[in-house]
């Protein structure tokens, strides 16, 4: 089973479980959260000249709870029976069930929302969550960054019966709850 994650963010809605990276965060949302609580001065926005609606990079962000649900759906898809024998047909290599119901081979699924949010979308959603304006500074593009990247989730929907449920505002609200309580 291979699950490809697309930018996990968020925290448990209780505010008890979340992400607290050591040092300066490498990922956008923990960085934005630390700006919101005053640990960091300003969000760096790397490029505002991409061919996207607001000029900033677009990524597919997925709530960590949706990601956990995706794992459960993947386990259910395997039926609790994962074969250990060698696959002998293309179908079993591709993860189709064998006659005995076991699955041999590899199932590959994208876990994301299937839609993209820009860097500024994330900043503004977090502003709504925390109730204040967050300072940001536009900086030059980083080498190798692409304009957009988001998941094609139709296979996960069709075969696992799974779709992401949380939107960006909920992801940011849960992250803010965690960050402000810890």
Locations of regions flagged by a protein language model:
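Conserved beta-loop-beta element that borders a ligand/cofactor-binding pocket
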Residues: 1-14, 42-46
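C-terminal substrate-binding subdomain of Rossmann-fold SDR/epimerase-dehydratase oxidoreductases
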Residues: 28-182
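Hydrophobic, Gly/Ser/Ala-rich alpha-helical and linker tracts in large acyl-processing enzymes
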Residues: 13-25, 32-35
């Amino acid at each position: 089973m291979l699950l490809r994650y697309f930018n996990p963010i968020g925290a448990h809605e209780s505010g008890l479980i979340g992400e607290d990276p050591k040092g300066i965060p490498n990922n956008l949302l923990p960085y934005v959260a630390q700006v919101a609580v005053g640990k960091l001065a300003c969000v760096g926005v790397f490029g505002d000249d991409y061919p996207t609606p607001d000029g900033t990079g677009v990524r597919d962000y997925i709530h960590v709870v949706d990601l956990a649900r995706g794992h459960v759906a993947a386990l259910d898809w395997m039926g609790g029976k994962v074969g250990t024998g060698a696959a002998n047909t293309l179908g079993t290599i591709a993860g189709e069930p064998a006659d005995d119901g076991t699955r041999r081979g590899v199932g590959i699924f994208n876990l994301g929302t299937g839609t993209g949010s820009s860097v500024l979308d994330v900043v503004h959603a977090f502003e709504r969550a925390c109730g204040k304006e967050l300072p940001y500074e536009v900086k030059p593009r980083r080498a190798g960054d692409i304009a957009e990247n988001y998941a094609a989730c139709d296979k996960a929907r069709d075969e696992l019966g799974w779709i992401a449920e949380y939107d960006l505002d909920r992801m940011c609200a849960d992250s803010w709850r965690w960050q402000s309580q810890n």
